[in-house]
Structures are given as C-alpha cells and as structure tokens.
C-alpha cells in the first residue's frame, strides 16, 4: 500500500510538473484573465473578467484547442451567449440572450455555413 501511494504521488507530481497557471491584470490592478498551460499550450479552464470585476467569458481548452462549453456574459452579469464547443468547432445549439437574460435566438448545428459560406435561415429559432 505504501509503495502504491508513493507511486501515485510520483505520477501526480509528474503530471503537474509542466503545468503553469497565469493571471493577467488591467492597469488598474483588477484581474483580467486566468488560465493554465501545460508544456506551453493552453489547457483547462480559461476565464476573462470585465474591468468592473464581473466575469465576461469562460471556456475550456484541451491541447490548445477550445473544447467544452464557452459562456459569455454581459458586463451586468447576465449570460449573453453559450456555445457548445468540441475540438474547436461549435457542436450543437448556440444560444444568444438579451441583456435581461431572455433567450433571443438559437443557432442549431445544421445551420452552420456550408462550403460556399451560405446559411439556411429557415430553421432558426427566433424568440
């Protein structure tokens, strides 16, 4: 059991050895961004704040590529948009909200631009 615990600790330390956390700040000193890298490549949670301290954006990275839910907020703290991202591309339904949090419209996966960069608007859900 002791050998297994030491082995697990070595693996854990090795896994995080090349990981770094970064924070950037506005000139006024308020936190602007927080993110992590592994071996110099963005990995994990990314967050960006407005100057007023309100979260403005949150996303996730895997091997330097967006992967996971991306959320954007208005400066008043209300969700502005959500995007389901997989391997750097929107997969699923992107949702857009007005400044009061009411769903304004959605873009479904099948409404992505085609190879000619055209979009079929017939199946968009407008509220």
Question: What feature does the model see in each segment?
Answer:
Residues 2-7, 16-74, 78-86, 90-127:
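Periodic aromatic/glycine/histidine/acidic cluster detector
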Residues 10-11:
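Gram-negative bacterial Sec-dependent N-terminal signal peptides
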């Amino acid at each position: 059991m002791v050998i297994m615990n030491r082995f697990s600790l070595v693996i854990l330390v090795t896994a995080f050895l090349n990981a770094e956390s970064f924070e950037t700040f506005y000139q006024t000193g308020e936190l602007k961004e927080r993110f992590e890298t592994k071996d110099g490549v963005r990995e994990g949670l990314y967050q960006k704040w407005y100057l007023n301290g309100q979260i403005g954006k949150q996303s996730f990275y895997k091997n330097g590529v967006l992967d996971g839910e991306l959320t954007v907020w208005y400066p008043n703290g209300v969700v502005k948009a959500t995007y389901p991202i997989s391997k750097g591309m929107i997969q699923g339904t992107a949702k857009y909200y007005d400044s009061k949090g009411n769903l304004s419209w959605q873009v479904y996966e099948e409404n992505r631009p085609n190879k000619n960069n055209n979009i079929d608007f017939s199946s968009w859900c407008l509220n």
